[in-house]
Each structure stands twice: as structure tokens, then as C-alpha cells.
Amino acid sequence: MGLEAAIIDNEVMTIRALAADDDRTVDARVAGPSALLVAKLHKLGERREKAPARLMDKDAYDVYRLLVTVPTQVLATTLDRLLEDDLAGGVTCQALGYLDEMFGAFDSVGAFMAGRAEELVGDPAVVSAACAALAGDLLTSVAGDVGPTSE
């Protein structure tokens, strides 16, 4: 579950060979950042509920990197579109619930995990706080009532 968003949020990209002397390319559809965020949040949320031992700091850090790298309004605009889609709407709403639960506060599990992933190279507290701030901004920017804390 959670991959439905990639059917809506995707684009064609040209993928090139890694070797400088290899000129092969292929055009392929790849998931957009909002679809990646939805999928990653489902992975984390489902593992938290069913297999906590399989939770990986790297997955939470991937959420952090998406929140930092992609402008909030870009994510929000696409997430609004996904919420309105018959196929992707339900899983997108659930993903935003996971975002709120797991990243919505500096001491929530996802924010803590993302910070822990930065332990040897940065400041975990800054990453955890940034997760909470960015998640809050995104949830505020997305139209409509989403997630478990909406009334």
C-alpha cells in the first residue's frame, strides 16, 4: 500500500549509463517526490504497526531529505491533487496521518529516527526539530482535513 500515488505523481526522465564512454539512455517513468513521500510514510507506518524491529533510521532520514529538498508548496500542491484522486486519495490521507504521528513533533518516533541517522555527521536535535517544523508546515499547507488529528 502507498504505491498508488506513483500512478498519478510521476514523470518521464532520461536515465543515462554511468560510464562516461557509454552513451546509452532510456526514458522511463519515475515517481515524483510526493509519491515517494507517500510510499516512504506507508513503509514506516506499516512497519511501526506490524514489525517495529524492521524500522530503519534511513527510511525516516529519506522523509527528512524529501521535506528539506522539495519546496513545501510543491509537495502540498501535488498532495492536494493526490487526495482528490479516487485511487490515491485514501492512501495519501493515511500517509499524511503517518507524517503527523511520526514526524509532527521533535520527539516523535520518525523525527527521532531521522535525527539518529545524522548522529555521526551532524546534529540529531537539529534534524529532529527540522522534521517537526517541516512536517507541520506541509500538513498546514495541504488543503482539507487529513490525518488522524483533524477534526
Functional labels for PLM-detected ranges:
Residues M1-E151:
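Compositionally biased terminal segments of proteins
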